[in-house]
Swiss-Prot record:
Record localization: Cytoplasm
Protein's name according to its UniProt entry: Methionine--tRNA ligase
Motif 'HIGH' region: where in chain: 15-25
Domain tRNA-binding: 580-682
Record-linked InterPro entries: aa-tRNA-synth_I_CS, Anticodon_Met, Met-tRNA-synth_bsu_C, Met-tRNA_ligase_1, Met-tRNA_synth, Methionyl/Leucyl_tRNA_Synth, MetRS_core, MetRS_Zn
Lineage: Bacteria, Pseudomonadati, Pseudomonadota, Gammaproteobacteria, Pasteurellales
Amino acid sequence: MTTQPRKILVTCALPYANGAIHLGHMLEHIQADIWVRFQRMRGNKIHFVCADDAHGTPIMLNADKLGITPEELIAKAKADHIRDFAGFNISFDNYHSTHSEENKQLTAEIYNKLKANGFIKSKVISQLFDPEKNMFLPDRFVKGTCPKCKAEDQYGDNCEVCASTYSPMDLINPRSAVSGTTPIVKESEHFFFDLPAFEGMLKEWTRSGSLQSEIANKMQEWFESDLQQWDISRDAPYFGFEIPGAKDKFFYVWLDAPIGYMASFKNLCNREGIDFNEFWAEGSDAELYHFIGKDIVYFHSLFWPAMLEGSGYRKPTNVFAHGYVTVDGAKMSKSRGTFIQASTYLNHIDPECLRYYYAAKLNDRIEDLDFNLEDFVQRVNTDIVNKLVNLASRNAGFIAKRFEGKLADKLEDKSLFAEFTAQAEQIAAYYESREYNKTIREIMALTDKANKYIDEKAPWVIAKEEGKEAELQAVCSMGIELFRVLMSYLKPVLPKLAERAETFLQAELRWDNIHQPLLGHTLAPFKALFSRLEKKQIDAVVEETKALFAAANKAAEKTEAKPTALSAVEPIAETITIDDFAKLDMRVAKVLKCEAVPESNKLLRFELDLGDHTRQVFSGIKAAYNKPEELEGRFVIMVANLAPRKMKFGVSEGMILSAGTGGSDLFLLSADSGVTAGMQVK
């Protein structure tokens, strides 16, 4: 531990003010909160801020649909988000909104500096325009077929199947996600940030060790494909900040969103007298860390540091990215009851259970985390209830009844105590590097040793023997001491359990007093510290989630306005001739092997038998089949004469046919019994 406290500012990605907080959000906020709480225990000067991302077309459209103003919508969202984060014991020093005076001023200041320094350009561009809604369509409000891999139902800016990025103008068969109509092309003047001007700086920053290796490697790919000018403006109607000196032009949400980190901190500084420039000025010696999801790495590792550099502010010390949350091996699903909102979870389960489970599986890499519901129950009960809390309860009773709550005046096993406290720096190193899984593994190994000590000493046997009161007190006091050390290590993960432990121990759990035993100390009466997690609680969460989804669907069916036609039955495609159809060679194929592609959220990899040879095919149906191995041995229908397509994860040699609207609503087509691999579909 350094003698001078570190100065640290930590942020989480800003949740969008157009929806509820769910367990995917909570992964990041729990990860960051654990790190922040650890730094506080180490005596560092740390500030932890966040805000709602409160601008953009989706908010404008949703408010209109609900018959309220965007301001009313984001105010309710902010209140809900603050409630949910507090419910999970996320210890923000400030939670603000990008729709704030601080953010408006900082956004204008940064834009004007970039413009004055020659980094803002303007040009007339062609855009997709919804003639029915009389509005230009943002990238995410256009859907169509990917121009690269031909995957259908993809957004206007990137493909979730092949991970390509492109312009909405490049989409095949585009349609408005607002009205369902075919958009037209219109011209408009837009403002662009000159990102290529910062390529040299960004390459140097990438090599500085400021980024996770996965991010640094990804940035090299982006450099190789050439950086592009970044469109930072949007046309009215739009909910956001108007660009200074440009009528009916607004800042794109992704320009003012990261500035929201600064604005939230500025709001905290104004309230508590903190020096804003000490953390944000160019040359600042404070540390700045952003915790984000892997889906927004592009913005945080390219645009954001370039904006800061171009406007005279410091760059982040590091950007920590994490993966997505899956549930029972599949993408979170509303219909299956696994797209769990934070509020739904809190209605039934202690938030510390999720904090512990996430910590036990989190590491410093960009990997998806699977929230396995059965394993969740087992791990919480085994580790926290049966091992950790039981260590305290099995010793506290003897101390209370036989010794009036007073601990022994000396340690029964000094070497064991030294072994436990000697792990403090290793555990601290794991916390520092965000390798929480190693932290938990180390702590639980010590917990097992503590319980083994009690099992071997058997205080319940000693208690029955006359003249062994001192030995009984010493053994049980040792058990309580080991519990205190373990709870000190776990305090960043389980803050509320730590509070209850502090009440029982009548002592504060601090990192700097881990080595100081509570000799001759008096305990408070022991009360239950933690409750078992029951399967029925999980079932209640799943059922409530399903009910919320069903109610939302019912409400959507009743509304007259249909903001999207994407969920309706797709219209019949353009008529083709029999000759066109004859070009397709569809075959029955037997699934020899099926497995998930770990790096993709959508893809399964199939090895197919076509009778006289085998093929590899990638299919974007991962969300619909969370146990891909169960598809092995099944017969499917595939287009066999489709040209092989080179994808990020290998070559796909055909297309497997399925029906549905996408996501988890996809169903493989199959054939009646009696077919054999390679049969042609007539």
